[in-house]
Amino acid sequence: MVGEMETKEKPKPTPDYLMQLMNDKKLMSSLPNFCGIFNHLERLLDEEISRVRKDMYNDTLNGSTEKRSAELPDAVGPIVQLQEKLYVPVKEYPDFNFVGRILGPRGLTAKQLEAETGCKIMVRGKGSMRDKKKEEQNRGKPNWEHLNEDLHVLITVEDAQNRAEIKLKRAVEEVKKLLVPAAEGEDSLKKMQLMELAILNGTYRDANIKSPALAFSLAATAQAAPRIITGPAPVLPPAALRTPTPAGPTIMPLIRQIQTAVMPNGTPHPTAAIVPPGPEAGLIYTPYEYPYTLAPATSILEYPIEPSGVLGAVATKVRRHDMRVHPYQRIVTADRAATGN
């Protein structure tokens, strides 16, 4: 029908929905504020976060999400200030963390109580400060007189007399619920506080999410199938990109072997052994052996020398009396010898 506004049902207060709202708030705070155009969005987002936390808190403590009547009468008379102290039973339960239970993660539980009751809730007395050294330093100073008292919760409210009494009564009832320790594993408020802390830290995971049916079917099949026990697989060392030394024979011994088998004039040495055929007979080239090719020239001492030459170099040179035959020597006949030609 034209003119009627469509009303949508509000989402249920679940941890996942609260986590989505917190993520939206972080994203909203990271964006620049363009002339205040996001003011209403931030206000609506804060109101929704407060509503979800309030419903979750009521569900945790009261066991239902039914909202208590928050209607207050009209103010009558001047504004007054009322306060009341509720002492924490630390002597009866010395190991219970009442301060963390009342304040909650980053003070969210106390802030939620203040928003719901309209009162200011503060933890005072011995052990109310996290830093014990600072607490001892401030003890006895002005405005720190409460450190000489026992641990207690101070509830204050400012309003008209008739309204302040109602607010204070509601706040006292809610705080008294927090001063009753629950058994380990049955503290629903502690579970909620841990969940809120995980949401704030970004580490929350919903434990109610079930695995797909396919995963269960595969797991059942794997359990029904026979199992074969095998030894652990050997761990191989990582392969190097470039070997430091060549795996095969280097190229220089083969070059020296060929140089030894050849005389300086190019003729094969008579005493040189022929390189046997095989994989080591040819020149082996690998792409990473080029540093070995830059070797100095082979010394002349590596070539074989005749034993007679070595002896002749040491002993005195022997004069030869026979005439060496010259290849171009002319033949002198008797007629030419007589004429002198």
Swiss-Prot record:
Superkingdom, taxonomy of origin: Eukaryota
Mutagenesis or variant effect for Y17F: Impaired homodimerization
Disease field: Defects in Qki are the cause of quakingviable (qkv). Qkv is a spontaneous mutation resulting in hypomyelinization of the central and peripheral nervous systems. Mutant mice develop normally until postnatal day 10 when they display rapid tremors or 'quaking' that is especially pronounced in hindlimbs and experience convulsive tonic-clonic seizures as they mature. Mice with qkv specifically lack isoform 3 and isoform 4 in myelin-forming cells, while isoform 1 is lacking in oligodendrocytes of severely affected tracts.
Annotated region (Qua2 domain), positions in chain: 182-213
Function: RNA reader protein, which recognizes and binds specific RNAs, thereby regulating RNA metabolic processes, such as pre-mRNA splicing, circular RNA (circRNA) formation, mRNA export, mRNA stability and/or translation. Involved in various cellular processes, such as mRNA storage into stress granules, apoptosis, lipid deposition, interferon response, glial cell fate and development. Binds to the 5'-NACUAAY-N(1,20)-UAAY-3' RNA core sequence. Acts as a mRNA modification reader that specifically recognizes and binds mRNA transcripts modified by internal N(7)-methylguanine (m7G).
Keyword Transmembrane helix found: no
Motif (Nuclear localization signal): 324-330
UniProt xrefs under InterPro entries: BBP-like, KH_1_KHDC4/BBP-like, KH_dom, KH_dom_type_1_sf, Quaking_NLS, STAR_dimer
Residues annotated with Asymmetric dimethylarginine modification: R242
GO biological process terms held by the UniProt record: 3'-UTR-mediated mRNA destabilization; axon ensheathment; intracellular mRNA localization; long-chain fatty acid biosynthetic process; microglia differentiation; mRNA stabilization; mRNA transport; myelination
GO cellular component, one term: cytoplasm
Record key words, sorted: Cytoplasm, Developmental protein, Differentiation, DNA-binding, Methylation, mRNA processing, mRNA splicing, mRNA transport, Nucleus, Phosphoprotein, RNA-binding, SH3-binding, Translation regulation, Transport, Ubl conjugation
A Pfam family reported for this protein in Swiss-Prot or TrEMBL: Quaking_NLS
Annotated region described as Qua1 domain, given as residue ranges: 11-82
Post-translational modification: Methylated by PRMT1.
Domain notes: The KH domain and the Qua2 region are involved in RNA binding.
Post-translational modification Omega-N-methylarginine, affected residues: R227, R242, R256
Effect of V157E: In qk-k24; induces embryonic lethality possibly due to blood vessel defects; prevents RNA-binding but not homodimerization
Changes seen on gene knockout: Embryonic lethality between 9.5 and 10.5 days post coitum (dpc). Embryos show a lack of large vitelline vessels in the yolk sacs, kinky neural tubes, pericardial effusion, open neural tubes and incomplete embryonic turning. Conditional deletion in cardiomyocytes in the adult heart induces dilation of the ventricles and a rapid decline in cardiac function, associated with severe disruption of sarcomere organization. Conditional deletion in neural stem cells leads to hypomyelination in the central nervous system due to impaired cholesterol biosynthesis.
Subunit structure: Homodimer; does not require RNA to homodimerize. Able to heterodimerize with BICC1.
Site positions (Involved in RNA binding): N97, K120, R124, R130, K190, Q193
Nucleus is among the record's keywords: yes
Modified residues annotated as Phosphoserine in this record: S188
Name of protein: KH domain-containing RNA-binding protein QKI
Domain KH: 87-153
Tissue: Highly expressed in myelin-forming cells. Expressed in oligodendrocytes and astrocytes in the central nervous system as well as Schwann cells in the peripheral nervous system. Also expressed in the yolk sac endoderm, adjacent to the mesodermal site of developing blood islands, where the differentiation of blood and endothelial cells first occurs (at protein level). Expressed in brain, lung, heart and testis.
Provenance organism: Mus musculus
